[in-house]
């Protein structure tokens, strides 16, 4: 889900059985998800819900479904959301995914260089493989308190276990703060973020 808006992806080279991502992570509308599935799994898996446009025949004791992906598309599709996603993909293609990647890579490096200057900030993961996202904690400050005070400065980050509890257990922590950059961010945004962290530390560590 996190990879798609930041870097070019080749399903042919990756060759996954399944691949998923969300429209809102591509600057599109919320409430829409995309699932790529190899044909062998489409044939093997049963629909998880019923509805119109996916049924061949319904009887009192059985049902038969349409073939292929259609058996998973029950009911009225999210038409407006699909149109919105199409527009966001047009936007990304117009800008160029390679340009987006290079811009975000430089911006993330700038953010990383600023963060590691703080001895009380712990960064998680291998930064050499990072794209756009940095997870961290500040010694002596709970990540939720950090998020709450940054919110008052109109800075939105995510905190908690990020639906990745095994990752948190590996580092023996309950959660962390996660900051991400996008094509709409600038170095001025990064500077404001770092300055705001300094202000939060003064408040919570005083």
Name each model-derived stretch.
Residues 1-206:
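Pyridoxal 5′-phosphate
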């Amino acid at each position: 889900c996190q990879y798609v808006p930041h870097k070019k992806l080749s399903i042919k080279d990756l060759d996954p059985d399944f691949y998923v991502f969300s429209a809102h992570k591509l600057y599109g509308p919320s409430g829409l998800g995309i699932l790529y599935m190899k044909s062998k799994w489409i044939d093997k898996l049963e629909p998880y819900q019923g509805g119109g446009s996916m049924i061949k025949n319904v009887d009192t004791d059985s049902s038969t479904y349409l073939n292929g992906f259609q058996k998973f598309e029950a009911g009225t599709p999210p038409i407006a959301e699909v149109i919105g996603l199409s527009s966001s993909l047009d936007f990304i293609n117009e800008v160029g995914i390679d340009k987006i990647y290079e811009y975000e890579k430089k911006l993330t490096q700038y953010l990383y260089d600023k963060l590691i200057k703080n001895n009380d900030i712990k960064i998680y993961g291998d930064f050499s493989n990072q794209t756009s996202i940095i997870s961290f904690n500040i010694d002596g400050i709970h990540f939720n308190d950090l998020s709450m005070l940054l919110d008052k400065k109109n800075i939105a980050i995510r905190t908690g276990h990020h639906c990745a509890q095994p990752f948190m257990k590996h580092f023996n922590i309950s959660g962390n703060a996660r900051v991400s950059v996008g094509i709409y961010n600038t170095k001025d945004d990064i500077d404001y973020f770092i300055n705001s962290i300094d202000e939060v530390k003064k408040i919570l560590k005083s």
